[in-house]
Amino acid sequence: MPRPILATIHRPALAHNLARARSAAPDARVWAVVKANAYGHGIEHVFDGLRSADGFALLDLAEARRLRALDWRGPILLLEGCFEARDLELCSRLSLWHVIHCNEQIDMLAAHKTQVPHRVFLKMNSGMNRLGLRPERFRAAWTRLNALPQVDEISLMTHFSDADGPKGIAAQLRAFDAVTHDLPGERSLSNSAGVLRHGDELAARSDWVRPGIVVYGSAPDFPEHSAADWGLQPTMTLSSRIIGVQELAAGDTVGYGSSFTADGPLRIGVVACGYADGYPRHCSTGTPVLVNGVRTRMVGRVSMDMITVDLTPVPDAGMGAEVTLWGRSSGGAVLPIDEVAQTAGTVGYELMCAVAPRVPVMTE
């Protein structure tokens, strides 16, 4: 039989979370962000759960082709725009909208010969200092784009660096408004944290919102808020089973480096999941795990193919017992991915994206 590890994608949870994002921005149209292969879930696996979105936002042409192959005929937005001039022809062919974040992309568009005018989102660098034109250069870029026959419509956008924390969005919002207040075009400012934490403040500038991580059931501002606090449901469950049991005596150690020592008799289960499956190697003793839906802890180091868990809270668990590494157990108990990520010093986004190709995936 196959190794018992499995990633399960929950389509009803995707639909629920998308509706939750929409309820926080009821007057906006929603880009469901499916970059990075839908945050590791698989574009094909999430599509049915997210098909009520007004559009899909992603990074590259290969992902856009996959959406069109699923018979999606609505808007698709390339969040990083076009990388080469030849990409513009594919944008025309696939009816893609694309971001313009630098003058070089305007140069490419000006030189592009097309019968199909492009819809573009002109991006301002309002303070995050990744992509975008600085405020003092933004209006000149807009004027130049507006004069191009290759351009049909210009929308305006920016991206917040601290919508999830105490610094907030005020400074970036002032920078954006100062330059764009009298420019026409739709606006798109809100990411996941913007939608949930600043919905009222941004409502007048939210023709489009761009929820990403919230769609996949993770809190954008954890640990201040949990996914449950925001009414989100887990969309990915990583599960496995116990494939071995050991009875330890006081002083016995576990795993590489003997990093865990039993302080008394202890029964542990060996789980078919390791860092080669995408489980974070930096997780250590105390990382939460569910066994038969009961919360317990990992002990020792994460190995390539295995972890070990304390069976004290589940004395009846043995060979074949269900183990939930994150997500929802078969009985409905939930282990938030954010909690597991926190113990590894990372974020839920990374865990979702890091599930290894060798892990089978099913949808429900």
Swiss-Prot record:
Name the coenzymes or cofactors required.
pyridoxal 5'-phosphate
Q: Which residues carry this modification: N6-(pyridoxal phosphate)lysine?
A: 35
GO MF terms here are: alanine racemase activity; pyridoxal phosphate binding
- Binding sites annotated in the UniProt record for substrate: 130, 304
State if Isomerase is listed as a keyword: yes
State the pathway, as annotated in the record.
Amino-acid biosynthesis; D-alanine biosynthesis; D-alanine from L-alanine: step 1/1
Keywords, in A-Z order: Isomerase, Pyridoxal phosphate
Q: Which InterPro entries does UniProt cross-reference here?
A: Ala_racemase, Ala_racemase/Decarboxylase_C, Ala_racemase_C, Ala_racemase_N, Ala_racemase_pyridoxalP-BS, PLP-binding_barrel
Q: Name one Pfam family in it.
A: Ala_racemase_C
Which catalytic residues are annotated? 35, 256
Q: What is this protein called?
A: Alanine racemase
Species the sequence originates in: Polaromonas sp. (strain JS666 / ATCC BAA-500)
Encoding gene (name): alr
